[in-house]
Amino acid sequence: MKFQLAVNLERLDDSLAMDDVARHTLEMVQIAEDGGFNIVWAAEHHALEMTIAPNPFQILTWWASETSKVRLGTAVVNAAYWHPIKLAGEAAFLDLISGGRLEFGLGSGAYQREFDRMRPGLLQTCLLYTSDAADDSLR
């Protein structure tokens, strides 16, 4: 059996300092590695009050520097926010400096309110209907 941990730098309210949240998150990642978990996942979120997670590659690079075995996954990178060449470069570099530990998750995002802030006018649900076209373009 394999175990995985999806964790964000999240807080329920602003009574917790984000540096404490970050420290606690790293401790959870290290405990997961020590406990034999095979993947830890970091998300991409923008302008949400509960979290600071604008770039999962930055979070995973930090975790890579503090771990040695656990695989590092993006859960997920929002395809609509990235140019494909930049995205490929970010993923390739993280995989290189982490010793080949990247698990790459690409998706359409979670919240329309993030799209409203990041890509005004683009509906998150529109991306759900273009997966066949995306699959063809990746072949």
Where are these regions (language model features)?
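Acidic/polar active-site rim loop that often engages polyanionic ligands
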Residues: 111-121
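Structural motif corresponding to the early beta-alpha repeats
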Residues: 73-79
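N-terminal beta1-alpha1-beta2 module of alpha/beta enzyme domains
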Residues: 1-72
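Single conserved hydrophobic/aromatic residue that forms the stacking wall/gate
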Residues: 129-139
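Glycine-rich anion/phosphate-binding loops
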Residues: 80-92
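Residues at the N-termini of beta-strands
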Residues: 39, 101-103
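Aromatic/hydrophobic pocket-lining residues that form the small-molecule binding cavity
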Residues: 21, 25, 56, 84-87, ...
